Each structure stands twice: as structure tokens, then as C-alpha cells.
């Protein structure tokens, strides 16, 4: 029962943090934001790693495969966990990247989610026109997408407990 409560608390914390971050004022994204489908796939894929995080045991092969997949196809989602270590502090995990790269045998660049690495693959765009900042017309859809992902993750977690 305590494990279920802890898991739901973790997922709720992740949802609140993600909603707060995506609801902040205009910003320049460092890495391309994942679409709702990509975020749902990433969160669902990494859900297999929760036992390794909560029980502090070695991750399963399924978890290692999910992290490896996220490294190659869903980097912006994985960087969200790597760049927000405060989300995992209740589980005494301070370095998400080190936890899985060491135990899964994955070799990752320590600067994988740094500003320069995250900006490198972005296509060149025209410089913004000086003047008043533009309003973020997609803010509501970002908040709705984040909330939807959170609800899906919490529902999936609740189904297994």
C-alpha cells in the first residue's frame, strides 16, 4: 500500500511540475518540445523503470531497453528527467542519467542535455523582429497536453496497483 501511495505521489508531483514549467511565460525551447503522443509514449515507456527507482534495485532489461529507446528517439522527454533531478529526490535518486547509464551499460555524453547539445539539432530560423514580446498562443494547448499526459500516466500506474 505504501508503495502504491508513493508511486501516485511521484506521478502527481511530476504532473504538477510539468504543468508549472509549461505554463510559465514565453521562452525559447532548448530542445524541440515533444508532441502529446511522443510525451505519452515516453512516459509510458519509462514507467517500467519505476520499480528500479522506488525499490533502489537494478533496473530490469525492459527498463534498460526503454531508456535506450528514449535516448535515441525521445531525447527531449528523457532530458526532462535528467534536467529536473528534484522530481526524483524523494526516492534518493539525484542523478537519473548516472543511475541508468551505469546499471544498464549505456554510454551517454554528460553534455547530452546541455544547452549547446540541445540546440545543435535545431534548424536555423529567422531572427525575431525586435519589439513587444509575442504572446504564446499555444500555452493552453501545452497545459492541456501536459495534463493529459499526467492523467494517462497516473491511470496506467493505478491499473497496475
From Swiss-Prot:
Glycosylation positions in this chain:
92
Q: Which SUPFAM superfamilies match?
A: Bifunctional inhibitor/lipid-transfer protein/seed storage 2S albumin (SSF47699)
Bilayer-crossing residues are: none
Location of the protein in the cell: Cell membrane
Keyword presence, Secreted: no
Where is the secretion signal located?
1-23
> Is this entry keyworded Nucleotide-binding?
no
Annotated membrane topology is:
Lipid-anchor; GPI-anchor
**What are the cysteine partners in each disulfide bond?**
42-79, 49-63, 64-104, 77-113
Alphabetized UniProt keyword annotations: Cell membrane, Disulfide bond, Glycoprotein, GPI-anchor, Lipoprotein, Membrane, Signal
Pfam families, alphabetized: LTP_2
| Propeptide segments, given as residue ranges | 139-161
User: Where is it found, in Gene Ontology cellular component terms?
Assistant: plasma membrane; side of membrane
Can you locate the GPI-anchor amidated aspartate lipid attachment residues?
A: 138
Q: What's the family?
A: Belongs to the plant LTP family.
According to its UniProt entry, the function of this protein is described as: Probable lipid transfer protein.
Q: Which protein are we looking at? A: Non-specific lipid transfer protein GPI-anchored 24
Organism source for this protein?
Arabidopsis thaliana
Amino acid at each position: 500500500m505504501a508503495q502504491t501511495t508513493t508511486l501516485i505521489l511521484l506521478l502527481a508531483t511530476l504532473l504538477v511540475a510539468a504543468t508549472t514549467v509549461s505554463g510559465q511565460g514565453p521562452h525559447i525551447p532548448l530542445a524541440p518540445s515533444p508532441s502529446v503522443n511522443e510525451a505519452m509514449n515516453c512516459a509510458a515507456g519509462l514507467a517500467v523503470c519505476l520499480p528500479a527507482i522506488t525499490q533502489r534495485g537494478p533496473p530490469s532489461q525492459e527498463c534498460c531497453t526503454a531508456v535506450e529507446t528514449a535516448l535515441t528517439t525521445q531525447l527531449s522527454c528523457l532530458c526532462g528527467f535528467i534536467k529536473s533531478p528534484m522530481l526524483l529526490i524523494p526516492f534518493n535518486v539525484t542523478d537519473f542519467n548516472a543511475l541508468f547509464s551505469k546499471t544498464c551499460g549505456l554510454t551517454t555524453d554528460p553534455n547530452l542535455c546541455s544547452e549547446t547539445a540541445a540546440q545543435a539539432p535545431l534548424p536555423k530560423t529567422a531572427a525575431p523582429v525586435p519589439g513587444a514580446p509575442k504572446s504564446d498562443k499555444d500555452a493552453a494547448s501545452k497545459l492541456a497536453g501536459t495534463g493529459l499526459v499526467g492523467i494517462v500516466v497516473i491511470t496506467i500506474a493505478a491499473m497496475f496497483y
